[in-house]
Amino acid sequence: MFRAAAPGQLRRAASLLRFQSTLVIAEHANDSLAPITLNTITAAGRLGGEVSCLVAGTKCDKVVQDLCKVAGVAKVLVAQHDAYKGLLPEELTPLILETQKQFSYTHICAGASAFGKNLLPRVAAKLNVAPVSDIIEIKSPDTFVRTIYAGNALCTVKCDEKVKVFSVRGTSFEAAATSGGSASSEKAPSSSSVGISEWLDQKLTKSDRPELTGAKVVVSGGRGLKSGENFKLLYDLADQLHAAVGASRAAVDAGFVPNDMQVGQTGKIVAPELYIAVGISGAIQHLAGMKDSKTIVAINKDPEAPIFQVADYGIVADLFKVVPEMTEILKKK
């Protein structure tokens, strides 16, 4: 039996929806927007109400122009100051608090990247609210879904905080269209520099390969490769597929590759069109970081390896024979 909602309840629900407003904290490198920000904008749009983006930094005019064209963005707030160089959370937090105070945003969010995970807990603490981390679905403006137990279970969280602060798993939401929008831009509210930390320098490793979290194809290796030198087999294969190269935690802990290549619960979350797992047994922590991939191919000589339980295609064979053969076949095409 269904019971109709009282008119007063419907009016309150409509009122709440009408007054929803979300502030997306843009992650960027001054001249380019981080892809996860586009996924976060899509998530923010599902809350209903107006979506604004806050861009803080130095010489970030191009990012502002690009954001104004993104579908679903109503307003871009801009704060340019040397204090925001490097997007330090200590400096960004007072700016976000002042912006929220002036515009009364009901939601504040960012991508669940190192940037967002570093910033949002501080913002939430200052607002005296509990943040919701790494959401994968939005059921309503106050109800979110996130994974627990290394991705083996889903947890639905109802948030009754006055301001909802949450981070968004980029792989769970489509990227917002980068054209079709016509947002206005204006200066963000001013805030005083905290001055307790200073951005000194950043050294980035440049690679011709795609960035791991944004690649359409990922080739990952595990402890089965036996050494860091043997990862050259994966690099050669990845070159033919225009793929990024990742690794399991076991391979990282063994010192085969640096930890910025780690895929998994404590590493990077990926969801490419094609994921090739080479010499990876399939610990649940690794599966949590790649199980949403569209197609998974596993290569392992152990037919009982857990990775085969999630793989769409499995090759039970010696990787030192199979991978070079795959590379040679691709070279001939």
UniProtKB/Swiss-Prot annotation:
Free-text remark on how the cofactor is bound: Binds 1 FAD per dimer.
GO cellular component, as recorded: electron transfer flavoprotein complex; mitochondrial electron transfer flavoprotein complex; mitochondrial matrix; mitochondrion
Acetylation listed as a keyword: yes
Main location as per UniProt: mitochondrion
Pfam families referenced in this protein's UniProt entry, alphabetically: ETF, ETF_alpha
InterPro entries: DHS-like_NAD/FAD-binding_dom (IPR029035), ETF_a/b_N (IPR014730), ETF_a/FixB (IPR001308), ETF_alpha_N (IPR033947), ETF_asu_C (IPR014731), ETF_asu_C_CS (IPR018206), Rossmann-like_a/b/a_fold (IPR014729)
Region entry Domain I, spans: 20-204
Record-level GO BP terms: amino acid catabolic process; fatty acid beta-oxidation using acyl-CoA dehydrogenase; respiratory electron transport chain
Residues modified to Phosphoserine: S140
Location of the region described as Domain II in the Swiss-Prot/TrEMBL record: 205-333
Expression by tissue: Expressed in the spermatogonia, spermatocytes, ovary and granular cells within the cerebellum.
Modified positions (N6-acetyllysine) in chain numbering: K59, K62, K69, K75, K85, K101, K139, K158, K164, K203, K226, K232
Transmembrane regions: none
GO molecular function, one term: electron transfer activity
Record PTM Phosphothreonine, positions in chain: T93
Keyword Phosphoprotein recorded: yes
Cellular localisation: Mitochondrion matrix
Keywords, alphabetical: Acetylation, Electron transport, FAD, Flavoprotein, Mitochondrion, Phosphoprotein, Transit peptide, Transport
Family affiliation: Belongs to the ETF alpha-subunit/FixB family.
Subunit structure: Heterodimer composed of ETFA and ETFB. Identified in a complex that contains ETFA, ETFB and ETFRF1. Interaction with ETFRF1 promotes dissociation of the bound FAD and loss of electron transfer activity. Interacts with TASOR.
Function summary: Heterodimeric electron transfer flavoprotein that accepts electrons from several mitochondrial dehydrogenases, including acyl-CoA dehydrogenases, glutaryl-CoA and sarcosine dehydrogenase. It transfers the electrons to the main mitochondrial respiratory chain via ETF-ubiquinone oxidoreductase (ETF dehydrogenase). Required for normal mitochondrial fatty acid oxidation and normal amino acid metabolism.
UniProt remark on domains: Domain I shares an identical polypeptide fold with the beta subunit ETFB though there is no sequence similarity.
Name of protein: Electron transfer flavoprotein subunit alpha, mitochondrial
Organism field: Mus musculus
Species lineage: Eukaryota, Metazoa, Chordata, Craniata, Vertebrata
Gene for this chain: Etfa
